[in-house]
A protein has these predicted regions:
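Binuclear metal-dependent hydrolase catalytic cores
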Residues: 1-140
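Cap/insert and terminal regions of metallo-dependent hydrolase folds
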Residues: 129, 136-138, 146-189
């Protein structure tokens, strides 16, 4: 199982869908915005509580190793207390290996070939989309992006395209107007 990003509530969503963080083979991060990584540490702790016995494989943009190291540093005392108090059979779930993605490339996780490619999520310097290949099927995930050539090229011939929506800052002005009008219309209905 592969998890893409770990935003707020990811552990709860996994549990609700009858999945366990202990069963995740790899974590792919599209970019390092909080809405995509805020629950990383909770995900890892939850996997340990679910008796995960393998080291985390985390793939992400440049800066991911430093980011994960800092999170683990911030929670070091709390983690050491848990380890000494809870006495679980393994601490492998609390270990990780980070693979920082280059500009464009591919990796293989189990039987799935994954092609990663840069997308345009300015001002973020490193943001990625992913195409997954398995059993002659192709799934492409855009990550946060504006329209860009790399996504259009990599999404070609996909069986499924999962595309995130990025709202331009300027759109907030019109969305507030539409929201106000919509709320007014709902009251009248």
């Amino acid at each position: 199982k592969i998890l893409i990003d770990c935003g707020s509530g990811v552990t709860q969503r996994l549990n609700q869908s009858k999945n366990s963080s202990a069963d995740i083979d790899a974590l792919l991060l599209t970019h390092l915005h909080t809405d995509h990584v805020i629950d990383l540490y909770q995900l890892i702790i939850s996997s340990w509580h679910s008796d995960r016995d393998s080291i985390w494989k985390i793939y992400g943009p440049k800066g991911t190793k430093k980011f994960v190291d800092k999170i683990f540093s911030a929670w070091k005392i709390e983690r050491e207390l848990r380890i000494s108090y809870e006495k679980r059979k393994s601490t492998n779930a609390l270990k990780y290996k980070v693979y920082e993605l280059k500009k464009n490339g591919s990796i293989k996780i189990n039987d799935i070939k994954i092609k990663y490619f840069e997308v345009d999520h300015k001002p973020v310097p490193y943001a990625y989309g992913f195409s997954f290949y398995n059993n002659n099927k192709k799934l492409t995930i855009s990550g946060d992006t504006r329209p860009c050539e790399s996504l259009m090229q990599n999404a070609l011939n996909s069986d499924v395209l999962l595309h995130e929506v990025f709202i331009e800052y300027e759109m907030n002005k019109t969305s507030k107007l539409r929201t106000k009008k919509t709320l007014h219309n709902v009251k009248e209905y």
